[in-house]
């Protein structure tokens, strides 16, 4: 699995480079710590016979923990479905049963995992093995799940290339504001980690507090984030230190900020990687979805 192999090599070369930061708690994990801790998750899952085509549900507190677990799950060759801790119990139970999950990983299980020795390497996987399940909100009925294969990880990395450059780069600090179960979260975090960038996880309430949002953007030196076009227009005066914005998920219209590279990304839950992209050069009443991403569509 190229993504995991590349991440392992990067972690060895840049052991102290920040990989994950929780903006709320200030918890920081370096690439070396992330790889070591995910190896403990891998070790736990391997001992419990959880590997290829087995699904686990991740429900750890929003911050660094869900990503430690997710990486460990992928190193074990298993699959994950992520839910937020504030999900309604009925919805959570339904997703657990519908996904066929064999393990529920909350903060207590996470702490148990951290007592295990760290396993090196990873299990072999096929690009068509199950890696992730993404569920809809269920506002029109029961949540519906989409199965994602390991191949999407490599496609997501290839889709990070726009024309002749990478959108997410090693120097970037990504503000993660999206729900953990959203496709956009995978679209943003996998390329960021692959390139050696830093992910700063914001609480879901931060975007509702403009002053706190601005404070976090400046305090954590955020250079890139995902926002809908509506949020961009509402908060454009607070984004002066941001260099790049990824937008999508709804109709993109009348979006342009001089001095900030804004990329309109077209994707789907069924794909979970960038299909088309456009670097916005002016305001459009209806922004084009752009051209197919290099090697991904």
Where are these regions (language model features)?
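Short, Asp-centered acidic motifs that coordinate Mg2+ and/or phosphate
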Residues: 94, 102-103, 173, 223-224, ...
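Conserved AMP-binding/adenylation subdomain of ANL enzymes
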Residues: 144-173, 179-223
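Adenylate-forming
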Residues: 61, 178-181, 205-206, 220-254, ...
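ATP-dependent adenylate-forming carboxylate-activation enzymes
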Residues: 24, 60-64, 78-96, 197-222, ...
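Adenylate-forming AMP-binding core of the ANL superfamily, especially NRPS adenylation
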Residues: 39, 113-137, 142-158, 244-254, ...
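A short helix->loop->beta-strand "cap" motif at the edges of active sites that frequently abuts
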Residues: 78, 197, 240-243, 258-261
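Conserved coil-to-alpha-helix start sites within the AMP-binding
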Residues: 60-71, 86-90, 177-195, 207-211, ...
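Carrier-protein-dependent adenylate-forming modules in NRPS/ANL systems
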Residues: 1-151, 165-167
